[in-house]
């Protein structure tokens, strides 16, 4: 079973100068004033997943470029974004795996990603292993995940499902043209899209294949 996310660090993203969170429970509730960075903190998780699956560049470009995402406040400005995820100790021989990505912009405001993997045990001593990749326009982690012969394949293989599941879903659009109110094909049911465009097809699949989970959803809505 994939180990859970245990610790999150975000630096330099939007209004966030630096935030550290211990994610030790199944549900984490974020409370803060408007503009304090709650949505940015959640978006950081999705951004990491998109770095790993090589779709972050398109996302950042559609958001007016990398530099526009940097923190800029009374305490100064930054020239990069840092996101760090630590996986709880699991199948990696009792070791915790930390993945870190630093996102910078080149002269054309295109993103460059520097990734780092670190393994640590309970002793508190220096890391048992640390390796940095990049800067590059593509994820080294994704490349390793596609290469069973790579020495880090086993560790990355257990990490990919965790980071790939970090997606943000926005269901609060109630306008006439909201994607959730549109049509979707029955076959578009492999995964739930972030804008809920295919929610009808997806719920149909859940109802047919996982009726217990479907009833839990129905009960929660009611």
Feature roles, as predicted:
Residues 1-17:
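N-terminal pre-Walker A segment at the start of P-loop NTPase domains
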Residues 19-23:
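Conserved A-loop
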């Amino acid at each position: 079973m994939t180990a859970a996310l245990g610790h999150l660090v975000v630096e330099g993203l939007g209004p966030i100068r630096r935030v550290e969170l211990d994610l030790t429970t199944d549900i984490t509730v974020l409370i803060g004033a408007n503009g304090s960075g709650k949505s940015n903190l959640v978006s950081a998780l999705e951004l990491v997943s998109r770095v790993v699956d090589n779709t972050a560049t398109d996302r950042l470009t559609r958001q007016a470029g990398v530099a526009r995402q940097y923190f800029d406040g009374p305490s100064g400005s930054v020239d990069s974004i840092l996101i760090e995820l630590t996986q709880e100790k699991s199948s990696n021989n009792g070791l915790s795996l930390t993945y870190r990505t630093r996102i910078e912009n080149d002269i054309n405001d295109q993103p460059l990603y520097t990734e780092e993997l670190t393994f640590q045990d309970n002793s508190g001593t220096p890391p048992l292993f640390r390796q940095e990749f990049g800067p590059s326009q593509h994820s080294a982690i994704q490349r390793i995940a596609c290469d069973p012969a790579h020495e880090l394949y086993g560790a990355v293989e257990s990490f990919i499902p965790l980071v790939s599941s970090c997606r943000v879903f926005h269901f609060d659009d109630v306008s006439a043209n909201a994607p959730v109110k549109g049509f979707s094909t029955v076959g578009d049911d492999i995964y739930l899209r972030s804008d809920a465009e295919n929610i009808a097809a997806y719920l149909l699949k859940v109802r047919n294949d996982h009726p217990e989970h479907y009833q839990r959803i129905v009960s929660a809505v009611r």
